């Protein structure tokens, strides 16, 4: 097998990715499969960090639209990401990995505070780092949190796993003639309003020259193939 094209990555998983065929919570079979994928990538020599959303448990923005205070809702959403991070930590540790959960909000009896230098040290020591609670601030999505953490740890690549196999010009579930892009610039994504991540996350990654690959993770071994240079999904990088 060829050498790795990327040595340090951050993988962003949605909370919904943990549900499987359910409509809420965590499917043990799904999280176990995802854990195997992550460990396979790490055993190949990559330093792996994770950010997991919380939408399978709670979505603050949705309840804010129904009248809940937005800041309160977002704080509840941050706690949901901590729950998912702990679940993934457990799944990874059962497979023999060394894992650290680091939170943007203080929950010291449950996990570590996020400290950039410590996070990098964990990765250098062969531990998988899971970053929870987004940026620690309301009004920012976990996509923005993933972009921020990827920049802070000096990741070579930000990966976002989605339900589809890349970025399309329109919703492929609704339009049979939808066309998938192999590559895009950040400016093209923002100008065309392609809603695969929020604009703040795209702008952060663009301004830091961080490449982003958006792909589907339903196929076993796909993460490892990307690390070895396979052109899977859509690569977003650079400016127009």
Curated annotation (Swiss-Prot):
Metabolic or biological pathway: Pyrimidine metabolism; CTP biosynthesis via de novo pathway; UDP from UMP (UMPK route): step 1/1
Modes of activity regulation: Inhibited by UTP.
GO annotations of cellular component type: cytosol
Origin: domain of life: Bacteria
Keyword ATP-binding recorded: yes
Chief location: cytoplasm
Biological processes, Gene Ontology terms: 'de novo' CTP biosynthetic process; UDP biosynthetic process
One GO MF term: ATP binding
HAMAP family for this protein: PyrH_B (MF_01220_B)
Stated family: Belongs to the UMP kinase family.
The protein's name: Uridylate kinase
Annotated source species: Xanthomonas campestris pv. campestris (strain ATCC 33913 / DSM 3586 / NCPPB 528 / LMG 568 / P 25)
